[in-house]
Amino acid sequence: MKIKSFIGGFDKNISYLIWCESTRRAGIVDAAVDISEIIEFIESKNLILEKLFITHSHFDHIKYIEDLRDQFPQLQLCGYYLPEEDFGVNHRGLTHHEIIPIGTEILTVLHTPGHYPDSICLWNKKDNCVFTGDTMFVGRTGRTIGAKSNISHLYNSIYETLLILPPQTIIYSGHHYGFKKSISL
């Protein structure tokens, strides 16, 4: 799986463009940054954007959904809990351990509540990487902010879901808070 990061948004947010090199099928992890650079890159690589994954529904991770939908009307929106009244048509609610293809690449959905009830991570076993949203950052765990956050759920998500992945798994988090954008578990 190929990965390209784009930094911007409100607080060093990161959106990731992921794609299958053999089929050119692509997805975006979080609609967190202005889409102009992403579109330019998609066009330069002749990629076919199919899916937009939302790691959780905090505004800084969903701000550019409509901009992406305007450019890519067929785009399927994928997240743990996506009510039609909030996200409109062509959305897909994901479940824990669900397998999602991007071309020949496979992502496994990991429900990781705590930072927010609908938080998910996306694990690519073959390339040993995980997109963690705000559940885990480089050098530290995510945090609990607001009434819907739950420290016990976050603890369980970290210790019972993420830290059981192979230790060489590379973390791609939702913000660039660390000394580098990604790091192994």
Tell me what each language-model feature is.
Residues M1-K45, C121-G133:
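Conserved beta-strand hairpin/beta-sheet module of binuclear metal-dependent hydrolase folds
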Residues F6, I18, H96-I102, H175:
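Short acidic-hydrophobic surface loop/beta-edge motif
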Residues F6-I7, H91, H111-P113:
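Short Gly/Pro-enriched turn/cap motifs at secondary-structure boundaries
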Residues K12, T23-A26, V33-T108:
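Active-site HxH/HxHxD metal-binding segment of metal-dependent hydrolases
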Residues L52-I62, L110-S119, Y172-G178:
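Histidine-centered catalytic micro-motifs
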Residues H97-I99, I106-C121, R140:
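Pocket-forming structural segment of enzyme catalytic cores
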Residues Y116-L185:
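Metallo-beta-lactamase
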